A protein has these predicted regions:
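A short beta-loop-alpha structural element at the N-terminal edge
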Residues: 2-14
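Hydrophobic adenine-recognition pocket in adenosine-nucleotide-binding enzymes
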Residues: 6, 90-92
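Conserved acetyl-CoA-binding loop of GNAT-fold acetyltransferases
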Residues: 23, 134-143
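Active-site rim helix/loop that mediates acceptor-substrate recognition in acyltransferases
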Residues: 24-50, 56-77
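Short hydrophobic/aromatic beta-strand element in the GNAT-like acyltransferase core
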Residues: 42-46, 56, 89, 122, ...
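Conserved acyl-donor/pantetheine-binding loop and adjacent beta-alpha core of acyl/acetyltransferases
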Residues: 55-90, 97, 107, 147-154
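Conserved GNAT acetyl-CoA-binding A-motif
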Residues: 106, 112-125
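C-terminal "cap" of GNAT-fold acetyltransferases
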Residues: 126-127, 146-161
Length: 161
């Protein structure tokens, strides 16, 4: 298993994993990943098993305190010197779930954010996933009023350093 950052040649695989992990209303499409990788490929954590992408975590950096729907749509909002590492997606192919791979990538994103001097990380998740992210130190801030992505109630969670 190898963890790496995203480059142009990873985009098709990233989009395929995303499509398998999220319903269409929530999944980013390949064109969105082209923009995301262009602006913040170094904030994608990709886990490869040989030459197969099996899991990834991604999100950009900003000074904004809260994750908003606009962030998903506008990769140019990325600010490499921002205070907060946002997490937009945590994806693992179904056949590879329950092996700790997503946790390994989340831990790597946390370590990188600390090393880069960020204030912490912010993500949104469905209610059933709150206990999962709490294991990494994220605190539930309640249902977000700034994200209704895919017409879902998202809980904002924050890990502050």
């Amino acid at each position: 298993m190898t963890i790496k950052y995203a480059a142009k040649e990873d985009i098709s695989a990233i989009a395929a994993v995303e499509a398998e992990c999220f319903p269409p209303a929530e999944a980013a499409i390949e064109a969105e990943f082209v923009e995301r990788v262009k602006y913040y490929g170094n904030h994608f954590w990709l886990l490869y098993n040989a030459d197969k992408l099996i899991a990834f975590v991604d999100g950009f950096v900003t000074d904004e305190l809260d994750l908003t729907d606009e962030m998903y749509e506008n990769a140019a909002m990325h600010n490499e010197n921002g205070a907060w590492q946002m997490i937009f997606g945590v994806n693992t192919l179904p056949d590879y779930r329950k092996h700790g791979y997503a946790g390994e990538l989340i831990s790597r994103a946390i370590a990188d954010a600390k090393q880069q001097g960020r204030k912490g990380l912010v993500l949104t998740c469905k209610e059933r996933l709150i206990p999962y992210y709490a294991k990494f130190g994220f605190k539930d801030e309640g249902v977000s009023d700034k994200s209704t992505h895919g017409n879902v109630a998202w809980h904002q969670m924050r890990l502050s350093f």
